[in-house]
Amino acid sequence: SNSKVPKMKVLITGGGGFIGARLARVLIDRGFLTGVAGDEEPIDEVLLFDSVDAPELFGKKEGGIAIRRTIGDISDRETVRGLIDRDDISVFHLASVVSGGGEKDFDLAMRVNLDGGRYLLEELRAHHGSQRMVFTSSIAVFGGAGMPSRVGDTVKQTPLTTYGVTKAILELLINDYTRKEFLDGRSARLPTVIIRPGKP
């Protein structure tokens, strides 16, 4: 194999949830990410980060990939700094206070959804390698009424909830960090997701 191809660390925030665990399974089974030029970048570490403990679904190592789990608070800057500990890293940012929770606790939604996301972006920016971020946004950025059946990048964002506002802001920040070439960022707007039982 080509020794110049960087081995990638994959960080999944919200890694204890349904989507995070499913994503981890797919990536571990596949064993590589696909780079910008279409080249395979082997994964050597997957870190599942979440605010709560989750069922143990993975071994400590599978197919040469080290699998680690960390519990912590994404709105703590030092915690985030510890997660972004190398240059060649791809972050799948799924961690979020959900819509109902954001309406009940504005400050929590701002801390987790906005500050946590911004800390990830800033820590990625501080590195100089192949830093990528895929952010799970939401159709909540469009609000509800009057949304067209087909939504392109030019449709105006009119969020009606704190959750939708935090998602829209982070999308804009990711676009700007990418424009400035601090990292390579993408946002994927998911439809309504069935959340895990219990907290959070």
Language-model segments: residues:
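Conserved glycine-rich Rossmann-like NAD(P)H-binding loop of the short-chain dehydrogenase/reductase
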Residues: 32-55
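Conserved catalytic-core motifs of eukaryotic protein kinase domains, centered on the activation segment
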Residues: 59, 101-108, 144-148
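Active-site Tyr-X1-5-Lys
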Residues: 144-147, 160-192
